[in-house]
Amino acid sequence: MKLKAIPLLARTRHGHNDFPKIAIQPGLLQARHKVTSAKPKASSTLAVTSDIARKLDKTGVWKKTGGRKKVNAPRAIEPRRVNIISDGLCDDILKYIGPSIERHRGCDLVDLNPGAGLWSRKLHEVLQPRKHVMMDLDAELYSPFLGDLLLKKNVEMMPKSGLVWKDLLEMIRTKLSDQHETTQDATPIRNDTLLVTANLSMCPKKSFLGFDSISSMVLYQFMSSIRTSTLFQRYGLVRMLIWVNDEDKRRLLPRAINRRKRSAFEAELSCEWIHEVAGQETEVQDRNALRDEWINTESACHTLQRMKAAGLVMPPGRESLVYSKLQSEPELWGQKLAGVRPPSLTRPFKLELEDLEQELPGSSETSKRLKALRQREKYEQEDALTYLELLQERDAATSLATSAPAKFDKANAAWNERIDNLKKNTRNEFNGFKDSNHLFRQAPPVLLWDRRAYEPLPARADEFFPNAPTALLDIQPKAMHPLFRQHGPSSSRAGDMSEVMLRFWFHHTLLPIHKAMEGLWGGFGDLITECPSVRDPSRGGTPMTGNGALTVRAMNGEQWAEILQAWMDWPFRPTYTQMLGRLVEEAEADADDEDTKSGATGLAF
């Protein structure tokens, strides 16, 4: 399949029977059981819970009725739009992150898809912007909701779509006269005089140009603009407050290593932070993307400590389960938990076992099931003890690498032999614990989720209309490594090359780094010696070999920069066109790409 440039894309600019209960059932896990076990009830997505929702409902835009609508009935050009309709949610959010956005007071505010405008009005009141430019293709439909806001002299509505790049670029060119573009060679700095907010949440979602929704595509392109200094990012590092469908937040902000795809890695390269300010409180979607519950607990404890230091508390009535649970368990705060206690996963059978153990003796079938589940729990506990031993042996061996090389070689070989003797599924599960622990133990942790400044505020589906679970992401770009900023034919194209290489890289996440390098192009694997951070524990590497070698999925941004530099310095590297032709075809042939689907990877090459 040939790549086609997407019309909307901006152009490049320059868990033993006597096993301690706490060891397999962390407090955080106990709290989660109540969430993960809940089955969603079938209900309409048009529940009315506020005056704004009632007015929206009366328009009839979201009601599916047979026959033709009345001639004068309100119509929507974008009828899939999800509106924020909860005053309480908006007030809680702005109070929660208020100190953080105070630096934008008096800024230029760009507001895409404001809809009924509740969020827009609240944000305007807090920021008192110099200029507030709104873009909404359904401006006529929503004008009765925005009347008082539109009367302000510093507020302007453009009845065009902020998701169509032609219209967006026109707005940027004509309405942001007080902003100044950064030069191509300059290191971009934070621009607090411009703030972008957008509502990309849709219900129902509809695939578009290979993406699972147009909002997924726009979010993808907003992130790309950071790397290429296009759109708003041409004016410096511009913060973005983006409303997205709740399920889309994990693309940029995964909570487990096997959800860390290319888009999440590139976000780590280009963003100082991505915070989930508010979102649906559930872990159901993570059952296939699990990690040690002790990592989750320790990560949450660290977050609560950061919140305490910053004077942050969750608003009354909007405390999350995690926040409430750990507030009552201060003995866990400040402790090293992961890698010290036997690892545990949130498995559905554990809740079933807990329920059966609380019931009175029943039928023989129930007794057989209970016996089987207890046996499974026993095996899992035994495996957990083995995993803990292996993690600790690995750490002990690593500590010998510099001080006692001979002892390290012996310990490394013995450890690898133990791994080789594990059954395949057991080995695979251990590797997941190993790599997750490796990412978490770096300073700071590699996943942006583990660096969060606060716990997300729980947001209910009925605080939106239609009632679609929606999340607010706070995205703050950072100055990337100079190599990653090289885009376009007038540059070294290192940034372009990085993007193409990562498409191959993240289809082979279980490979050791040196094998992945060799897979990029024959002979490149020999340059592993030019990438010392891969084997340096102080920089997120490991001296372990074989089963203990650093894998692609456990790589950090600094290591990728080193690998890219080695590539750019390699006299035998292929041209950009050769790489594009070979590696994009390989990436497209693999259907397991959550970043984009089908031919949607089409960049404006």
Where in the sequence are the language-model features?
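C-terminal target-recognition/interaction regions appended to catalytic cores
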Residues: 38-68, 460-471, 475-605
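Catalytic cores of RNA-modifying enzymes
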Residues: 5-486
